[in-house]
Amino acid sequence: MTSLFTQEIRLSKRHEKIVSQRLMLLQQMENKPEDQNKGRASQTQAAKAALQRNVSLLKDIEAAEKSLQTRMYPALPPEVAALETLYWASVEEYIPKWEQFLLGRAPYPACSENGNEAEDTIPKRAQQ
């Protein structure tokens, strides 16, 4: 009988231990969503802060790039800018004439009487 009584006490203690572990696990399960929400909130806040920092850094980099470009490539004098505009207009005008030749589909484009079509056109445009 003593052995049954001892066994009963041992089982009772084990039961209490299991019940206390269960209670502890239930409390952890209840606290886990709260902890996860806190973790998500802190992650969201950190992500927003990182985004603001990145936007600020990007603006600083763009400003530095613009500053360097103006130092490296100052504005052209108006005469040079006008010549550049005339040059690119001339190039765009002659592209269709030369395109087929460059692709190997047509003969060399015919030039003006003196042999250089560009020499005739550029002074005329500069006078306009």
From Swiss-Prot:
It comes from the Eukaryota. One of its GO terms (cellular component) is cilium. Keywords: Cell projection. It is found in: Cell projection, Cilium. The keyword NAD does not apply. Pfam families: CEP15-like. Disulfide bonds: none annotated. The keyword Lipid metabolism does not apply. PANTHER family: CENTROSOMAL PROTEIN 15 KDA, GENE, 49355-RELATED. May play a role in ciliary assembly. This is Centrosomal protein 15. It comes from Bos taurus (Bovine). The gene is CEP15.
